Amino acid sequence: MADEAVQEEGIEEEAPAGETKEQKRKRMKQTVLNRLAGARVDTVRDRVVWIMNREITTRDSDITLMLRYWELFEPELYARGNITPDSLYQLTRLTVISRHRATIQNDYKLFLASEEVQAKRGRLDGEHRERRVAENPHMSSIVVYADESGKTADNLLVGTFWILEDIQTLRLKQDIDAWRVATGFKHELHFTNASQGNLHRYLEILDLLVARGNSISFKVITVPRRGNANAPAVLDDLLFHVINRGIQHEHQSGRAPLPRSLQVWKDAEEEARDRVSVANLRERLEAASAAGFDRQLHVQSVTAVDSSKNDFIQIADLFLGSVNRFLHNNRAAGDHAKDQLARAFLAAFCGDGGIHRIENDMVTFERL
């Protein structure tokens, strides 16, 4: 049976000693968000979360949620609605899907149903009402993964990896997972770890990205660190500017025209700083939507997540490392594996001129 073949919950991490019920709820909620950020769909819960995140109508109807689950994750059984009696016994049951939906909405307060449906379910909570005014059930999404660098270097940089259609997060994650299985490569993807011994693996990841080139982009912004004493605050400002200008670029180029919803996933730093920076970034992006985009940009979420299990933030790290190498190491002209990776990465997405002479709309580079 499908709901037995796929784990319902996954292996739960060990609870800290003396953990309270509320602390467990917060920890489990963050685990759900971390797995969503990495497009991990190994369990029934992962899959329910992934669908509810991208399709608003599934938050109100368990039947709609179940049908989308079958269509996306069990297509060989669902067969476009031509369900046989044998298949019906194997498809993930409505009760299983509904139980996960209820936990996600009621316990974690994520992807809440409309107020009308919450009222019918007896779960309407004014303190946790979701901002739904600007949401459109059929609105496309832009997903941005962000990394930062330069706190001890000459320049502060923020690099971002953009997926212009949220369904492509699942497709690319499937590509990467299949590559990991085929190659046995289980390590994190970090530019600093590139060596002659593993360079070919990094170049294989680059090939996967090139194959998805019509649905992704990269954007970076930099400013000298000298004169900017509060580096964390400057990096927060840079993240806002690279996203705000990136939205303008994608809209004007026609690659991702508005209206769109926006999800931002940034590499987690210190918890206290993250809470403030995430809240500030969301408010600034919402203000930018009203002032510059005629409210055609709906800021769905801004979340700090652990990058150690997130391939997409690690891809942002590869891009940022390549740019850094190009800018500060003689345009990556050496023979070191990092030079070769930087040249290959920038040539693939910028053209032969590197970051200084970008030949397409897939990369933007700005200095402040």
Q: Positions of the model-derived regions?
A:
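Phosphate-ester processing/binding pockets and catalytic centers
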Residues: A2-V143, E148-L368
